Every structure is written in structure tokens, then in C-alpha cells.
């Protein structure tokens, strides 16, 4: 705290911006003492502990996901989560709806993959209708220790699959996919929305405050995604959802459009503008 006050006295900032986490506390507290305008950015649909502590004290909460659960009387605006240029390159990519031609399913489970997501997806393949098994091509992110097991399950199902621990070109693959199966991290939600793809979301049950379920809410309520909790997740349930989307070009196209409607491709600029305005005006 004293260090933060010394830094403020030296640097004389016109605004202080926090992104959550305990290291932000001293600067935000010191800014309050010095009556410097403060903003916090929350990437998830539920505020983290530090952002929750300051939500009613700062000028505004910049929300990366919408809706976001907020304390009463907290001022907030949906600005979105900034994404990489590699994602923006495929913003609102033309969507090829499912039909009687090769179809692409992208399965991603966060930065290090997810055993339950990849395994359940692999086991769901044998439960799909024959026309889907014949047409489907799957790109599945898998934890390194699970690769051999998942490869065998896909092979036994007869569905063509590319199995990798990490895909360097997820945005490109997502732009080519008819459907995405994904965890509900804030970055994944932003990518799916900006590129504009139908999705089946499987929130990570152990996420702090169950924030991944909250992250899913906007896409689900807009009709862009289906959500399956880990407690509900089985190969049969997942196969039914995959079949539902990939058997209807109208439904899939509607979901893709709904995803784009939730996107914030200009999130970085919106956030920067917010900072500049509050920095100049003080509120």
C-alpha cells in the first residue's frame, strides 16, 4: 500500500485500471485515497473476489462477458474481452452450414485440454447417425497423457479425427468448423462469438464461483449455444446435441448468426475509449 502511494505520488496517473487479483489491491486502494478515477475490468460473468470488493467503489466495471453478475448499485458497461489479431482475422467468417458434404467438428478444452471433454466426445462418435459418422472430420484437443487412448476410441468409431495436445491454428480451424465443442472460459467464449460458430459448451465444474457456467449464459440465452454441465455430460447426451445441430442447416445457421450478435470485435478500442473518457472527465 505504501509502495503504491509512493508510485502514485511519483507518476501522478490520471486513472488507475485493475484487472482483478490480489496484486491490484494496493493500487486500487491508494487510488481511492488520492481520489484518482478507477476502473476495473472483469473478464468472466461472475466477479472475482478483488473485483467484487471494489465494484461499487470504482467509476465503472468494464465487463468482458455479458451478462455479468454485479453487486447492487455497481455501475457497469459491456465492452467485451479483447482477442488476438489471429482471431480478429476470422471475425464473422462466412459460415458453411451442415449438409451432405464433409463436416468439421472442433473440440477444445482450454489451454491444456480436458480429459472429460475429449473422452466423452470420442465415445459419442459411435452413437452418431451413419451419415454423420461418414461425413464428420474431428479436430480434438487432448491432454498429452490421453492421446493414445483417445486416438483408439476415435479409430474404433470409424470417425476421422486429428488428435493434438495443442493446436497452433485454433482460429482458422474454428472458422472452418460447422460446430465447436468447448469449455466456457472467457477467451473461448469471445473467440466463438467473434468468429461466429454454433457451439456446445461444457463449463468446467471446478472453476471458481462456477464462473464458466455464467460465461455460457449469453450464448445459450441468445440461441447460439447449448450447454451441458459435467454432471449431465454423457456420450449419449453429447451425441444427441451434436446430431441436433449437424442435422439441421437452418438451426446451425441461426446459431452461427446468434453467436456473432453477441460478439465484441472492437473490445480493445471500446475499453481504451472508456479509459480515456474517464481519465479526462473523472467519471
Language-model features, listed with the residues they occupy:
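Active-site-proximal region of nucleotide-activated glycan assembly enzymes
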Residues: 32-92
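An amphipathic, basic-hydrophobic alpha-helix
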Residues: 1-15
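Short alpha-helical segment that forms part of, or immediately flanks, the ligand-binding pocket
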Residues: 29, 171, 189-197, 217
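Structural loop-to-beta junction motif characteristic of Rossmann-like glycosyltransferase folds
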Residues: 36-37, 178-179, 196-204, 224
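A short, well-ordered alpha-helix in the C-terminal region of glycosyltransferases
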Residues: 251-265
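Donor-nucleotide binding loops and adjacent catalytic segments primarily
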Residues: 92-179, 213-217, 221, 228-238
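Acidic donor-binding loop of glycosyltransferase active sites
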Residues: 13-15, 175-190, 197-198
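C-terminal alpha-helical cap of glycosyltransferases
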Residues: 264-283
Amino acid at each position: 500500500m505504501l509502495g503504491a502511494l509512493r508510485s502514485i505520488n511519483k507518476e501522478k496517473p490520471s486513472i488507475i485500471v485493475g484487472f482483478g487479483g490480489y496484486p491490484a489491491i494496493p493500487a486500487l486502494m491508494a487510488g481511492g485515497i488520492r481520489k484518482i478515477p478507477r476502473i476495473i475490468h472483469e473478464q468472466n460473468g461472475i466477479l472475482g473476489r478483488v473485483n467484487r470488493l471494489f465494484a461499487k467503489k470504482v467509476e465503472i466495471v468494464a465487463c468482458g462477458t455479458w451478462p455479468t453478475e454485479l453487486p447492487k448499485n455497481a455501475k457497469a458497461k459491456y465492452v467485451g474481452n479483447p482477442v488476438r489479431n489471429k482471431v480478429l482475422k476470422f471475425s464473422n467468417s462466412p459460415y458453411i452450414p451442415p449438409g451432405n458434404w464433409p463436416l468439421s467438428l472442433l473440440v477444445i478444452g482450454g489451454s491444456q485440454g480436458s480429459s472429460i471433454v475429449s473422452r466423452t466426445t470420442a465415445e459419442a462418435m459411435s452413437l452418431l447417425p451413419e451419415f454423420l459418422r461418414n461425413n464428420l472430420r474431428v479436430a480434438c484437443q487432448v491432454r498429452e497423457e490421453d492421446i493414445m487412448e483417445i486416438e483408439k476410441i476415435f479409430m474404433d468409431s470409424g470417425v476421422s479425427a486429428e488428435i493434438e495436445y495443442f493446436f497452433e491454428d485454433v482460429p482458422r480451424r474454428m472458422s472452418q468448423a460447422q460446430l465447436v465443442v468447448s469449455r466456457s472460459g472467457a477467451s473461448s467464449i469471445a473467440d466463438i462469438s467473434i468468429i461466429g460458430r454454433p457451439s456446445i459448451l461444457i463449463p468446467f465444474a471446478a472453476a471458481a464461483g462456477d464462473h464458466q457456467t455464467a460465461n455460457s449464459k449469453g450464448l445459450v440465452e441468445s440461441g447460439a449455444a447449448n450447454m451441458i454441465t459435467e454432471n449431465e455430460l454423457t456420450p449419449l447426451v453429447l451425441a444427441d446435441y451434436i446430431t441436433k445441430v449437424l442435422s439441421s442447416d437452418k438451426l446451425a445457421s441461426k446459431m452461427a448468426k446468434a453467436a456473432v450478435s453477441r460478439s465484441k470485435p472492437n473490445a480493445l478500442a471500446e475499453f481504451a475509449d472508456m479509459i480515456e473518457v474517464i481519465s479526462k472527465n473523472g467519471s
